[in-house]
Amino acid sequence: RVGYLIAKPEIASKLRENVVANTNVLAIQAAITAMNDNEFYNFSLKKVNEGKALMYKAFDELNLEYIRSNTNFIFFKTGRPIQTFNQQMKAEGVLVGRPFPPYEDWCRVSMGTIEEVQLFNKALKKIFS
């Protein structure tokens, strides 16, 4: 996993103090190559946005509160302990995010393929209907 930060120098300097691991040369080169692949970037962005639109629609239909996201994941309120929700989704063949204290009834779900998002929505509707 490779990440990067765009920040003011003083903030980047402060954050750099907490870096716990170095990234190897192969990972860095792979990240640079990926960042320069505009066609794949645009394809991925399109698919993530399509997935989020499908999830937003399901959340709206079920009246579930959620936070609109500029990332590849969505944070939404389940209204039940996350451990309970995780078990319910797992029983439907879907694995979802870990707890994010103190938001014990919220779930973070990452985008997958459109087919995976559809499976997620089907399980979600079964659990909340």
Describe each PLM feature range.
Residues R1, N70-N72, Y103-D105:
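A generic structural signal for well-ordered coil/turn residues at beta-strand boundaries
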Residues G3-I6, F85, E115-E116:
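Short, hinge-like loop/turn segments at secondary-structure boundaries
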Residues R1-F59, L64-I67:
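PLP-dependent aminotransferase class I/II
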Residues A12, Y41-N42, I82, N86, ...:
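Internal amphipathic alpha-helical segments of the cytochrome P450 catalytic fold
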Residues N49, A53, A58-E92, M111:
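Conserved PLP-binding catalytic core of the aspartate aminotransferase-like
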Residues Q87-V96, F100-S129:
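PLP-dependent enzyme catalytic core of the Aspartate aminotransferase-like
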